[in-house]
Amino acid sequence: MTTRDDSDPATGDGSAPPHRVHPPRRRVVGRIIGVAALVAFIVAAPAVARLLDFGVRVGEGAAVESSVEGFYGSATPTPASTAAPPGTIVRSEPVVGAPDGAAALRVVYHSTDVDGADILVSGLIVAPGEQVAAGTRTVVSWAHPTTGIAPHCAPSSGIAPFALIEGLTDLLADGNVVVATDYAGMGVPGPASFLIGATEAANVLDIARAAQHVEGIGASDRVVLWGHSQGGHAALFAAQRAATYAPELDVRGVAVAAPASDLAALLQDDIRDVSGVTIGAYAFNAYAEAYADRLPTDPLSTILSPAGVVAVPQMAKLCLLGQNKRLHDIADPMIGSFLSADPATAPVWSELLQENTPTERITVPLFVAQGSKDTLIRPTVTAAYVAAQEQAGATVTSHVYPEADHATVALTALADLRAWMRTVG
C-alpha cells in the first residue's frame, strides 16, 4: 500500500508516507466511554501492568519513540483543515508490530464532540497485507476498554496497541479491516470523553469513515461495531446514532462484551472499591468539563468529599497501564469516603448519567457476551439490558460464559463472535 501527502499543512513536511490517503468524498452529516476491561485485572496485578507498559516498537520507516507524542498535535483543527468532514485523515504514519502479513497506520482524523464541534481524534487502521479493490472488505470498528483518559493513555501511542484490540489476528484472518479509535482526549490532547456517549459514538463511526480514505486496503461502507466494557458503551451509542450521524455507513451489527449499559448501577455497584473510585474519577472529570455549562460552579464539590475533589484531577492524569501503583496510592484511602452525594440522584448529575446510558432500541443485530464471574459489570445488569432490548424488539444473540470474568470475557466470546459476524457482515 502507498500513501501520498497532498501538501496539507497538517500532514508534515511533504515527504511520502507509506499508505495513500485519498481526499474524502463530501458528505452531508448531521452535527449532532465504561469501564475498564482492565480495571479489575490490573488493580489486582500491578506487576503485569508494569510488564505491559512499553513504548511503540519501531522499525525502518516507522516513527521513532521520541516522535510519537509529537505526532498527535492539538485537538483543535488547523485553519487549513477545519472544513474537512468527519473521517478525513489529516496525519498518518506506519506502525510496526501488527500481526504477520498485516499493515497498520496510526492516524489523526476529524470527528465531533458532544456539542457537534469539529475535533481531531487519533487511532489505528489495520488491514490484511494484500491489496484489494475498494469496497471489498468489511470494517470492524473496535472500541477499547478503559486505559485512562489522559492523552498519554491512548492505545495507539504505544501501550501494547495491537494486544489491546481483542480478536485482532482472527478478525484480520477473516478478511476484515480493523479500526480502533483512541477516543477524544486521548492521543490528541483535548477534553476527555469517558462515558460520554455522543462523543464516543462519533469517534467510533468516524474512524470507519477514515478507513475508506486509505487506498489499497479495500475498506467498504459495511461496518460491524465491536466493543468491550467502556468500549461496549461506545459501540452501543454508535449503533444508536449511526443512522442519523453516519447514514452512508452500512452498519451490519454491533457486538459488545460486558458493556457499561447502566451507568447509575455501575457506580452504585463498584464505588466501594479501587476500581469504582477510579471509574468515578475518570467519569466525573470528563463530565465536569464536557457539561460545564449545565453543571453548577465547582461541580465536583456537589457530589464528592473534599478529598475526592482534590483526587479527581490527579487520577485523571494517570493511566491504568503503567501507573497503577499511583492510582492505588490515591484511591485506596478514599474507599468509602469518595462521594458526598449519590450522582444517580444529585441534580444535573443524575440527568447526565441517564443521557449517557444507552437505552434506545438497537435496530441492527446485537451480540452480547457476559461472564458469570464478572465483578465489575454485574451479570444481572447485562441480563437486564438484554431483556430490555428483546422486549423492545431488537434482534439479540446473547451468550453467558460461566468461567469468564471481566478481563477474559471478550476473548472467551471470540469464536461465537466470529460465527455471528459471518452471518451479519
Regions found by a protein language model. Give the residues of each.
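Primarily recognizes the serine-hydrolase "nucleophile elbow" in alpha/beta-hydrolase
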Residues: 210-279
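C-terminal catalytic histidine-bearing segment of alpha/beta-hydrolase fold enzymes
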Residues: 341, 345-351, 356, 367, ...
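Accessory cap/linker subdomain of secreted extracellular hydrolases
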Residues: 74, 257-358
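Short, surface-exposed "cap/lid" segments of acyl-processing enzymes
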Residues: 113-174, 187
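Catalytic-loop region of hydrolases
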Residues: 27-38, 45-132
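Short beta-strand/loop motif that positions the catalytic acidic residue
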Residues: 362, 367-374
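Alpha/beta-hydrolase active-site loop
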Residues: 194-215
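Acidic catalytic loop of the alpha/beta-hydrolase fold
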Residues: 372-377, 407
